Regions:
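The feature marks long, low-complexity, polar/acidic/proline-rich intrinsically disordered regions embedded
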Residues: 39-218
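Sensor-1/coupling segment of RecA-like P-loop NTPase cores
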Residues: 1-18
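Conserved P-loop NTPase catalytic core
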Residues: 13-58
Length: 218
């Protein structure tokens, strides 16, 4: 809405003598029933991510059946509903076995994505699309990536680009980062600006640990 209002203001001159916000007036004429996308909390973000990831994994008919099953389970177990292996195995064992990675990724990322994106589902979908694109590009180059490591690295790139650049430009000859090792050990001597940064500390707690990983290809 802000982008459209800004574009209208730049296109059309204000009417002299009239205190009219031309951008706002235009939007009110154009959009009769504005729909606000609600923010998602951590559990809602997790479920949303699981649905997006499984949609890419399953054919249309099977995905629709799974969504019906999950919605039914959600109604029955509203307060303690959780999508996990045990829930999926009751639906289809093959699907449960083949989607473990997707479920784990959603559980890994949802808390920090929910906080970092303020529960915005559109930006969450954009992040997952970027993750998928990175994987496809790596596959095209015959490079095998660990999705959990890639996702964690992308979180840093997305939310803390300065720290990401510091880490990526200072890898040792084995592709390891001394900055990550220090931060994982709660040593902020060389990264004092992040000592009280709750986001960075939450990011460090996300599995897997990266201190001894070769990050060169990420």
């Amino acid at each position: 809405e802000r982008q459209i209002a800004y574009a209208v203001k730049n296109k059309f001159k204000e009417i002299k003598g009239q205190e009219i916000d031309i951008g706002k007036e235009y939007l009110e004429k154009l959009i009769q029933y504005p729909i606000r996308i609600p923010r998602l909390n951590s559990k809602e973000m997790e479920f949303y991510m699981i649905c997006l990831l499984l949609q890419k994994k399953l054919d249309t008919e099977k995905f629709a059946e799974l969504i019906d099953y999950l919605n039914e389970q959600k109604r029955e177990k509203f307060l303690d509903f959780d999508v996990d292996y045990e829930l999926l195995i009751n639906f289809d064992k093959d699907i449960a076995d083949n989607t473990r990675d997707e479920i784990n990724i959603a559980k890994q990322l949802s808390p920090i994505l929910s906080a970092g994106l303020n529960g915005n589902p559109r930006q969450c979908k954009r992040f997952l699309n970027s993750l998928s694109m990175r994987e496809k590009m790596a596959s095209f180059r015959n490079v095998e990536l660990d999705r959990k490591i890639l996702a964690k690295i992308m979180l840093l790139e997305y939310f803390k680009p300065v720290l990401f650049e510091t880490i990526s430009s200072n890898l040792d000859d084995k592709g390891r980062s001394s900055h990550i090792r220090e931060i994982e050990n709660n040593d902020f001597q060389n990264n004092k600006e992040y000592e009280d940064d709750s986001w960075v500390k939450n990011w460090i707690d996300v599995e897997p640990s990266l201190a001894e990983k070769d990050l060169t290809k990420y």
